[in-house]
């Protein structure tokens, strides 16, 4: 379980040290050990959510993230220590939509812990991580984050620390302003490539693409953790050629074999998109800078043939 620092979501080109992995829950504490941090805790499933929550929380709560960097949340399995570590948290923040609901199947794991689904108030796009679910990747649209995620984060953390409600609300307002500025920056950065199509490693970018006028034509990985079949890859090649695609994107959390094969067949370059980022990932170690990174990558890739 990774701790998030209590600081603003990262802006452009910044970096900072992050705390180490937590000690096992319930370990004994002798008199010569450092005193425990008694700050109330909140748990977030993925890094972007944890980073947003850490800013809103400030020093009022310690936010811990379950999924480590470079892991795929849709195939992630929490360890027994991580499951045990949820006990006693003041809030459990999850995305929902079938992507990060692993603990809901563990009897008693969330007993007594208030659970908040960020996607609970959003009409999800088609194309989810599980049977009958919609696309859960709503955090890649900063307007949805500002208008839907942020109020839920604020309410959950204020309920966890009612004595700190005014400070939590003030930090949420400041974050809303930063998200508005990010949206404006992305809209301007992507304006020259509006209407252009790209192929991603997996279908994570529908909300982002719809917000900023680009088109996610298709994805290499149709199922989490599985490389595409030869037939599926051939169909994607035909569709990409017909649409004039000249960029393919990989992601750090998924295998590159299919994406590299597709790019070689199309004779187009490969770029990196990162839906999750993480502590210590240069240029992607905070929500704001992560979205800027991805917007810049798409703008560069789609603008390279203009």
Where are these regions (language model features)?
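Sec-dependent bacterial lipoprotein signal peptides
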Residues: 2-27
């Amino acid at each position: 379980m990774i701790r998030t620092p209590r600081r603003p979501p990262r802006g452009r080109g910044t970096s900072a040290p992050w705390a180490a992995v937590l000690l096992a829950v319930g370990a004994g504490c002798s008199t010569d050990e450092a005193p425990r941090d008694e700050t109330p805790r909140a748990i977030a499933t993925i890094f972007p959510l944890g980073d947003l929550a850490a800013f809103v929380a400030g020093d009022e709560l310690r936010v811990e993230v379950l999924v480590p960097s470079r892991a795929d949340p849709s195939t992630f399995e929490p360890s027994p220590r991580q499951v045990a570590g949820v006990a006693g948290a003041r809030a459990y923040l999850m995305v929902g939509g079938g992507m990060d609901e692993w603990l809901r199947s563990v009897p008693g794991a969330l007993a007594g812990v208030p659970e908040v689904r960020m996607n609970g108030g959003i009409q999800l796009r088609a194309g989810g991580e599980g049977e009958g679910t919609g696309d859960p990747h709503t955090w890649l649209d900063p307007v949805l984050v500002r208008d839907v995620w942020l109020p839920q984060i604020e309410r959950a953390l204020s309920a966890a620390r009612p004595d700190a409600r005014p400070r939590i609300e003030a930090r949420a307002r400041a974050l809303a302003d930063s998200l508005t500025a990010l949206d404006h920056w992305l809209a301007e950065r992507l304006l020259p490539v509006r209407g252009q199509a790209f192929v991603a490693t997996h279908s994570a970018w529908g909300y982002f693409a719809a917000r900023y006028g680009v088109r996610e034509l298709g994805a290499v990985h149709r199922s989490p953790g599985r490389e595409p079949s030869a037939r599926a890859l051939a169909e994607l090649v035909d569709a990409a050629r017909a649409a004039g695609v000249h960029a393919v994107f990989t992601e750090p959390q998924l295998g590159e074999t299919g994406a590299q094969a597709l790019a070689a067949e199309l004779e187009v370059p490969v770029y990196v998109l990162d839906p999750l980022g993480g502590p210590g990932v240069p240029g992607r170690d905070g929500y704001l800078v992560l979205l800027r990174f991805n917007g810049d990558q798409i703008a560069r890739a789609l603008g390279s043939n203009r």
